[in-house]
Amino acid sequence: MREFGSASWRDIVRWRANALEIVLYMDAPPSGPSYLGLLARHIALLTAITEEWRELETSRMPPSAEWVATQLAVLLGKELHTAFPDYRTLLARAVENPTDSAVQAKVYALVLELLKAAKAHNAQRPALLLAADHLASHLGSQDERSPEWDARRRALRIDGLTWHWSQLGASWFYAHDLLWRIWKEYPASPWGERAFVRLLDLGWDTSVGCQKGSDQFREVIRQGEAFLARRPMSPARAEVKFLVAQSYETWWSLSQASREDQYADPARYQDGATTARQKAIAVYKDVLGLVPTGPPSTYARRVLPRLGLGFPTNQRRFFCVYD
């Protein structure tokens, strides 16, 4: 990897031991006197940071942050392909064009169809309800008093779906009522487990305005570890472990927050922070064993060098701020 500003370096000597590299060089810049320079760097750490910057330049969100939702969309699309072949296509359009009125109308119509089908099909009911929930999360309005949206909300409220106005976000947000219902009524089913994973992914809090408090990571850890203890071989264990690892990483990072941080007081998170870092490392390694490729493993490989060195990672995945 070429060092920034190294065009004028001369007499370069390098020493390398495992991941650590030390570079001694003479710099003769075009203007100013020559000087002896010393550079030390951790190769794995530098590579991870560089890859992260490149990724953030090309995506609105890291793929790892959307992994659970993406996986769920794929699974639901396969399960319901025969009866609802356009489900995944419409879901993708809703993600890309969240305020398009034509897309919103189609999303609303399909949510109603899914809810109707769920009432008639006992065997597929959990999957149909989960599909309706996942699609309904892309249904809303930026107009607080829209008559059309008000009529849609009233119709969907009959099936237990509710939306709440976010003053800060200036939009209506779905409360994921169906997720809670599925997890309560079908906890032993594969789709009940998928609802559980999605609730973890949402910080175990589907309210507007962090109503359950800012420290979502604590409940994600509690719920996730209890799930893994009861169901160590669950098909969803990789997702649960990844979310638990991110929760421990969040705890560690909050304990290392700057004193000037407007939202996180590092003093509040010191108790247990070292253990949280160690557990984050251990669980991320478990994730690498379960999912060797893809967004979670890519993320784990990038963050492990920093955690291993005891550096803050600025992870705030499960720290809720409403401001």
State where each predicted segment sits:
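Acidic, polar-rich low-complexity tracts and alpha-helical solenoid repeat scaffolds
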Residues: 1-323
